[in-house]
């Protein structure tokens, strides 16, 4: 273990011509064995380092998403962009996957990451959770919390959550307390919780979390972050507040100034956005970002780019957007430093935009060179092992399936087997399936279940004799945002079979045998019996390639279906040929000289069992025709004779607005009808819709789905309707504007949400598309409907 590195007074900080505080004071320097302690404080107008103003120019990088061997390279790039601080999440589940067993070794060595940042002249902002979000499995919360009953205890003062969270934070203090600036390290500030305003309103919960961080031994300033429209909701005097946004810094800073005196800071400025499987690759405007960054710096504000460098969600750590949209393995984020650490035009634009705000005499170092890449000639995977023939012998027997967590299974592949008696054709149905399932009768595939569409039914043919029913379930990711983080996996009972009859009666399907391949924390492969040739059904495949040296490459998985890749026993991550990502980043340090073994799990079967290594990634190729088969939709809007629950106009601008109905309305479905937009154009857009109950609180969205949408943009950008109910203000539903789909996409536009059950709706909360004044799609006149069946068909 290395010792802490020293600091020197590199520059004196004075006010520049722009009026911005300069950010070059007291930067870390490598080379000495003694580190000086510093005082960091939050002043009336500035952050103060040893009593002098410090303007924080920060960028986010998650060490868990970057090979340890490349941490220095990425930190050098962050420094070269003009930043003086790196922001780092800790993911609780990454360090405590099994309760009470902490791991800070190797890739998880957060203290070493801090030391390396200090050596590169960077300060550190630490975000230890306990909740993180970050498109990470369960938002960083450990799965074993879900062994406790209930769907409303996470991120609350319930002892079932608070007690293990306190223990986690004590462990963080033990591991990283010496990395604070007060003890000669680089950590300036520590965040408490994360965007709690998106989730709850219990201010005493925030106070409890603050106390837990203090009790863990942190003595640097503590802060909380929230989106602009939630800053006031959860602000408490004991915690400094920063605002998160991807546009309109003036509004964000205004919200901060309304609740506290002190420096202005954007805690997350979105340089791009994350990708989800099956949706277009997302990008962020460099020009708009540079304008906003300069506006913040010119206003004496500080910022943190989310992300400066996104990297890759290696292994099985990817999260899932609500209601259920799994995130891609690539976490490129369209950040200024690309997935493989590359810098280019976007990086150069950010660097040029920040340069005028450097301290006098502060010099930007050159960006590090790209790591070299190599191509790999196509190689065949000639051996396979059927999943159902390679399940472990350990069998769990249960009358009705329960969530995996109840069986102490974390994630992976799970087989559920039982016997169905002879009988007529009918419908097999589970209460819930998390996440995807393939149904077999006597070994023959008969259908799939898919939580993305809440499709938990499969039609079964008549049976002349008893048959073996087997359901193979695959867990993809736990939801990382909203109340849906209570995301218990597996086949949830009761499971029923309803025969086709004049008066059908559902029959319980019971007495299940359950066997699982638990991939655990690091996606460890089970023992597998490979044979030459192609196995039937879901299978593991094995092959390999020779390498003279280890250089970065991008594995082309476009010929495969859906599953996981391992290289030399290391779990590289998930792939899915529906896109938009078609390649998998393989870092050079993970490639051996000589023979390299590759194992691929493919659940739907490869079209060609070959892989090649490419010199560049493919991040933006959609293949919807390769998705799981689903019944064709016959959904039709049916508003004839339905009286609107409300008709009126939204206010202009980007602020969130509450609309209360004259009288509550009851039904299962809600329709927002856009009649026109403020800009007079044919488009409609919504960042977020929530519904209000009589008490003014938002209704639970856990079982919401989109029942119907008249138009959505799906080619130029991800303007899908699900964006309107995913809890994120930074993306949005947008009606079609590109190609043939746009020609008939005119007002009125309708979006129908199925609430998952009967509900009383007393109003709605509408968040317009965010951005500069004049962005397209902000709705002016509208109608709101509530009814039992506003959409007919399936």
Predicted regions and their residues:
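N-terminal secretory signal peptides and thylakoid transit peptides that target proteins
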Residues: 2-18
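Short beta-strand-plus-loop segments that form exposed binding edges in beta-rich domains
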Residues: 471-476, 600-605, 673-680
């Amino acid at each position: 273990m290395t010792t802490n590195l020293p600091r020197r007074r590199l520059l004196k900080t004075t006010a520049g011509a722009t009026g911005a505080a300069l950010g070059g004071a007291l930067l870390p320097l490598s080379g000495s064995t003694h580190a000086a302690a510093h005082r960091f404080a939050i002043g009336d107008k500035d952050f103060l380092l040893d009593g002098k103003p410090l303007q924080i120019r920060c960028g986010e990088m998650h060490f868990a998403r970057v090979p340890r061997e490349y941490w220095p390279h990425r930190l050098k790039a962050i420094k070269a962009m003009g930043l003086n601080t790196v922001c780092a999440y800790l993911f609780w589940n990454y360090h405590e996957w099994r309760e009470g067993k902490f791991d800070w070794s190797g890739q998880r060595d957060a203290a070493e990451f801090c030391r390396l940042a200090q050596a590169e002249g960077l300060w550190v902002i630490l975000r230890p959770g306990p909740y993180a979000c970050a498109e990470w499995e369960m938002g960083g919360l450990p799965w074993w919390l879900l062994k406790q009953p209930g769907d409303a205890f996470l991120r609350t003062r319930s002892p079932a959550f608070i007690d293990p969270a306190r223990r986690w934070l004590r462990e963080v203090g033990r591991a990283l307390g010496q990395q604070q600036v007060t003890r000669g390290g680089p950590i300036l500030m520590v965040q408490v919780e994360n965007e709690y305003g998106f989730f709850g309103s219990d201010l005493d919960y925030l106070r409890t979390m603050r106390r837990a961080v203090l009790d863990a031994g942190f003595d640097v300033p503590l802060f909380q972050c929230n989106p602009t429209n939630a800053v006031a909701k959860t602000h408490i005097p004991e915690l400094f507040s920063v605002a998160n946004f991807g546009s309109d810094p003036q509004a964000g800073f205004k919200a901060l100034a309304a609740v506290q005196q002190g420096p202005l800071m954007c805690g997350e400025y979105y340089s791009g956005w994350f990708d989800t499987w099956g949706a277009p690759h997302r990008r962020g405007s460099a020009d708009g970002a540079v304008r906003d960054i300069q506006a913040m710096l010119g206003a004496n504000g500080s910022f943190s780019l989310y992300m400066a460098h996104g990297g890759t969600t290696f292994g099985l750590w990817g999260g899932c957007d609500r209601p259920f949209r799994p995130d891609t393995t690539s976490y490129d984020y369209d950040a200024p430093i690309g997935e493989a650490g590359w810098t280019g035009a976007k990086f150069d634009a950010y660097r040029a935009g920040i340069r005028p705000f450097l301290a006098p005499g502060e010099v930007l170092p050159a960006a590090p060179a790209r790591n070299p890449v190599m191509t790999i000639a196509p190689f065949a995977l000639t051996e396979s092992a059927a999943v159902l023939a390679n399940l472990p012998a350990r069998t769990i027997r249960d009358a009705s399936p329960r969530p995996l967590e109840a069986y102490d299974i974390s994630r992976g592949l799970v087989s559920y087997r039982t016997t169905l008696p002879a009988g007529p054709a009918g419908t097999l149905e589970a209460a819930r399936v998390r996440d995807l399932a393939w149904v077999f009768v006597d070994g023959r595939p008969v259908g799939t279940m898919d939580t993305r569409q809440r499709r938990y039914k499969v039609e079964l043919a008549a049976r002349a004799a008893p048959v073996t029913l087997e359901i193979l379930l695959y867990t993809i990711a736990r939801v990382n945002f909203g109340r849906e983080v209570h995301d218990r996996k597996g086949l949830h009972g009761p499971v029923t079979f309803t025969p086709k009859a004049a008066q059908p009666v559902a029959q319980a399907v019971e007495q299940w045998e359950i066997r699982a391949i638990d991939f655990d924390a690091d996606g460890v492969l089970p023992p597998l019996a490979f044979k030459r040739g192609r196995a039937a059904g879901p299978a593991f495949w094995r092959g390999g390639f020779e390498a003279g040296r280890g250089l970065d490459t991008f594995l082309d998985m476009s010929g495969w279906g859906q599953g996981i890749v391992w290289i030399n026993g290391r779990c590289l991550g998930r792939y899915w040929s529906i896109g938009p990502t078609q390649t998998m980043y393989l870092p050079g340090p993970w490639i051996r000289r000589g023979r390299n073994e590759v194992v691929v799990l493919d659940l739907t079967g490869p079209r060609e069992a070959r892989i090649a290594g490419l010199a560049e990634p493919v991040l933006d190729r959609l293949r919807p025709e390769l998705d799981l088969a689903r019944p064709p939709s016959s959904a039709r809007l049916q508003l004839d004779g339905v009286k609107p629950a409300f008709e009126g106009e939204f206010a202009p601008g980007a602020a969130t607005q509450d609309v209360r109905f004259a009288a509550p309305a009851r039904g299962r479905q809600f329709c927002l009808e856009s009649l026109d937009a403020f800009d007079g154009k044919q488009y409609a857009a919504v960042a977020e819709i929530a519904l209000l109950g009589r008490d003014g609180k938002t209704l639970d969205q856990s079982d919401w789905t989109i029942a119907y949408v008249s138009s959505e943009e799906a080619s130029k950008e991800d303007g899908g309707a699900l964006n309107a109910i995913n809890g994120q203000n930074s993306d949005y539903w947008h009606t079609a504007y590109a190609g043939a789909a746009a020609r008939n996409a005119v007002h009125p536009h309708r979006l129908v949400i199925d609430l998952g059950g009967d509900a009383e709706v007393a109003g709605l909360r509408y968040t317009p598309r965010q951005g500069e004044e004049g962005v397209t799609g902000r709705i002016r006149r509208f109608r709101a409907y509530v009814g039992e069946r506003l959409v007919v068909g399936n």
